[in-house]
A protein has these predicted regions:
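Polysaccharide-binding and catalytic clefts of secreted carbohydrate-active enzymes
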Residues: 68-69, 76, 104, 117, ...
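Hydrophobic faces of well-ordered beta-strands that scaffold small-molecule active sites
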Residues: 26-30, 71-73, 121-123, 188-190
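Catalytic domains of carbohydrate-active enzymes, especially glycoside hydrolases
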Residues: 51-80, 183
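Active-site-adjacent "subsite" loops/lids of carbohydrate-active enzymes
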Residues: 23, 31-54, 112, 122-182
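N-terminal post-signal-peptidase region of extra-cytosolic proteins
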Residues: 45-61, 91-107, 174
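Bacterial N-terminal signal peptides
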Residues: 2-12
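Aromatic-lined carbohydrate-binding/catalytic grooves of carbohydrate-active enzymes
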Residues: 66-102
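Boundary at the C-terminal end of the N-terminal hydrophobic targeting segment
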Residues: 15-19
Length: 239
């Protein structure tokens, strides 16, 4: 079955392991933010679709040649996605239009091409940040800030999912379940699973009073993030 793998920038393993790992992960991220890695071409015509696919194939070929064995493919950015979702809209980087259908499923294509090359493909999902006001406005009624108002909070001209609201982990679980149940991903990679930087005034005081249960604010927030990981891990394993 599909495994769920959470990779973090800081390893909890000793710096010098006593034994060699059975499987060495040599991974690279492929980001879609601003088209920094991919895509450069908009999928608005048959030729554009073909070129967009070719751009991804070229990246995968170069990674394979460089002896990488794992691709962390950006699957969710900030409240929008790069796969056919019933929950969130397509990212505008694909077609130039929010929610615009690129004429194919980028995640399915990435998985297929990775597997052809003997590489794993993990769904890289940004979790808590939802983007700035301009980005959120561009999503319109499709934005989670419109559909799930209770779990979204504005902070310093940006929007975030609220880790302290119990429904947040359920919403993220819906997204992960959608990906894991529909696609042959080899793992799920969580990014930005944290509170915003320098967030002493992050607006979660109501939830802290309601759910804090005697903990300090800092401990409660740490527990919230741990609970999200545990909830989704257990949920996927139970599928």
């Amino acid at each position: 079955g599909t495994s769920l793998l959470f990779l973090f920038l800081l390893s909890l393993l000793p710096l010098h392991a006593q034994t060699s790992p059975k499987h060495e992960v040599r991974a690279a991220w492929i980001t879609a933010v601003y088209g920094l890695d991919w895509p450069r071409t908009k999928a608005t015509t048959p030729a554009g679709i073909r070129r967009q696919k070719e751009e991804l194939i070229d990246i995968l070929d170069r990674l394979k040649e460089a002896n990488f064995n794992t691709v962390l493919f950006q699957t969710r950015t900030r409240g929008d996605v790069l796969y056919r979702s019933d929950i969130e809209p397509f990212n505008s980087i694909l077609t130039g239009k929010t929610g615009g259908d690129p004429g194919y499923d980028p995640l399915a294509f990435a998985i297929e091409e990775c597997h052809k090359r003997g590489m794993e493909c993990h769904a890289w999902m940004v979790t808590i940040p939802l983007g700035g006001k301009k980005h959120v406005a561009s999503l319109g009624k499709q934005s989670v800030t419109k559909r799930e108002r209770d779990i979204c909070v504005p902070y310093k001209n940006e929007y975030f999912l609220n880790p302290g609201h119990p429904a947040t982990k359920e919403y993220l679980m819906k997204l992960v379940r959608e990906v894991v149940s529909r696609y042959d991903v080899d793992g799920v990679h969580f990014d930005y699973l944290r509170y915003p930087e320098n967030a002493p005034r992050f607006p979660d005081s109501y939830d802290f009073r309601r759910y804090g249960k005697g903990r300090t604010l800092a401990q409660w927030r740490r527990d919230n993030l741990t609970d999200i990981v545990r909830y989704i891990y257990n949920g996927v394993k139970a599928m």
